[in-house]
Amino acid sequence: MTSGKEDYLKAIYIISEDHELVSNKELSDMLHVSPPSVSEMIMKLQKEGYVDYTAYKGSKMTRKGRREAGKLFRFHALWEVFLVEKLHFSWSEAHEQADGLEHQTSDMLAERLDEFLGHPEHCPHGDPIPKADGSRKGLTFRTLSDLKEGDSTTIRRIVEDYSLMDYLPVSYTHLTLPTIA
């Protein structure tokens, strides 16, 4: 599979977490490509069994597509953990490097990397790392806005805003802050 197809699968996967059908416009905006390019790639992905496309409604990932996208997120997350924990990259630097490395990673390399890292459950910013089959645990975290004055909490996940991530300490683990009134 080409890295371009993999990027589309990842984008569809991300957008479909909010709603099942993903429009070509959403993909065009996210990937910064023209609408005709999106249409062409969606047809290729449908032909290969990764998405089901309904005209004027959008694309929906098939089980095969979701599994493949989950593997890509696994590869990406494992590389982020390695780059942050072992090579001391910032979150944004690790993300950028992992974007390239994920496309070059085999299942065997990912398995060995996972073992070397001690089977991490979360990437550096707190998202669960998918299992080898591409499946992923759901998130059950509360947002900071759910807290009441005087509460304290442990931040376990940071939404991928790299300007914010570079401002915060590299490891999200056990970063405990009092509620700010």
Can you say where each PLM-predicted feature lies in the sequence?
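Key DNA-contact positions within bacterial/archaeal DNA-binding proteins
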Residues: 36
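Basic, amphipathic "hinge/linker" alpha-helix immediately C-terminal to the N-terminal HTH DNA-binding motif
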Residues: 57-76
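Short, hydrophobic-biased segments on the C-terminal half of alpha helices
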Residues: 42-43
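C-terminal regulatory/oligomerization modules of transcriptional regulators
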Residues: 103-162
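A short, conserved structural fragment
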Residues: 48-54
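Single conserved hydrophobic/aromatic residue that forms the stacking wall/gate
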Residues: 174-181
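N-terminal helix-turn-helix DNA-binding core of bacterial DNA-binding proteins
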Residues: 2-33
